[in-house]
Amino acid sequence: MSRVYNFCSGPAALPEAVLKKAQAELLDWHGAGVSVMEMSHRSSEFMSILASAKARLSRLMNISDDYEILFVQGGASTLFSQIPANLANGFESACFLDTGAWSSKAIKEAKKYTKVNVVGSSKAQNYTTVPDFSTLELDESAAYLHICPNETIGGLEFADLPETNLPIVADLSSTILSRKVDVSKYGVIYAGAQKNVGPAGVVICIIRKDLLARSSDDLPAIWNFAHLAENDSMINTPPTFAIYLADLVFEWLEAQGGVEAIEQINIRKAQALYDFIDSSNFYSNPVDPVYRSRMNVPFILADESLEALFLQESEAAGLRTLAGHRSVGGMRASIYNAMPMEGIEALIEFMRGFEERHG
């Protein structure tokens, strides 16, 4: 068996060490005689897994006791509705920064629950840059400000935050644990697992405890952040195996030196790929260099008719899932934490050879 380099935007590659450990423990977790997939979510064994996952994540992100860590079922798209349903209660509106496809989806869903104030948008620039924060039309009486600091489809990322007293709600699905984040500056951080954390099916939700009081008892219990916090994310059976794998990924990340260490690796990976693209007359990236994503690198071939051949030859070379999102086309390399530098080097070597053959 030979594994390929998987550049899928999600579900994304997992560290091979994590997969091997899960494989070794699959039939018998730590002598329990059962798989994690089979054990009761209220057993002492699973409770220890859940506690470990929360503790490791707290260490990795330096999360204070002012925050609650929830493991929410579904994907981040579920939170597009769940967040306004909980946090906009008692408020007339919520503010949103529109920087790409995922911001737009969050805006669309939030409109079903509250008045949405789009305080800034880069749609007119085809989402290749970020609005000037000094021009944002923030309503300080709103429920919160929602942002998506990394847009996977457009390959755009920003690290700075707007100046506001509003709770900042951030979709970090594609950047969580890839770079250092000051959690204390956020009201809510949420992230679907299937990019940098584990398999699909669970969402990490880090919520400032004072915001839990906004959740109304009229909400379904399974959607109520306060009820989820009171029940340690276990109002019903949580996605146990996904949480277990997340804990293994957290363990792996600690062994790499933590978020600070992986961030430096991610900088080197992204810089190498962007440097090659910029040096080429055959490939190009449309995003403002200031806001290029470290996690998702879209690129365009000079001759669009060669795209199918590029994908065919790259897959044959062991470079999987390089097609851009169906809404934008082109190519895209998603290079999350689990992608080693060797994968970037292999991609660059292939791209150089393809250009020599077809450029």
UniProtKB/Swiss-Prot annotation:
Gene Ontology CC annotation, any one: cytoplasm
Binding-site list for pyridoxal 5'-phosphate: A76, S77, W102, T152, D171, Q194, N236, T237
Highest taxon in the source lineage: Bacteria
SUPFAM superfamilies: PLP-dependent transferases
Protein location: Cytoplasm
Pfam families according to UniProt: Aminotran_5
UniProt keyword terms in alphabetical order: Amino-acid biosynthesis, Aminotransferase, Cytoplasm, Pyridoxal phosphate, Pyridoxine biosynthesis, Serine biosynthesis, Transferase
Obligatory cofactor(s): pyridoxal 5'-phosphate
List of residues that carry N6-(pyridoxal phosphate)lysine: K195
Residues reported in the UniProt entry to bind L-glutamate: S9, R42
GO MF, one example: pyridoxal phosphate binding
Reactions this protein catalyses: O-phospho-L-serine + 2-oxoglutarate = 3-phosphooxypyruvate + L-glutamate; 4-(phosphooxy)-L-threonine + 2-oxoglutarate = (R)-3-hydroxy-2-oxo-4-phosphooxybutanoate + L-glutamate
EC number(s) given by UniProt: 2.6.1.52
HAMAP family: SerC_aminotrans_5
Function, in words: Catalyzes the reversible conversion of 3-phosphohydroxypyruvate to phosphoserine and of 3-hydroxy-2-oxo-4-phosphonooxybutanoate to phosphohydroxythreonine.
Family per record: Belongs to the class-V pyridoxal-phosphate-dependent aminotransferase family. SerC subfamily.
Subunit structure: Homodimer.
Protein name: Phosphoserine aminotransferase
Native source species: Marinomonas sp. (strain MWYL1)
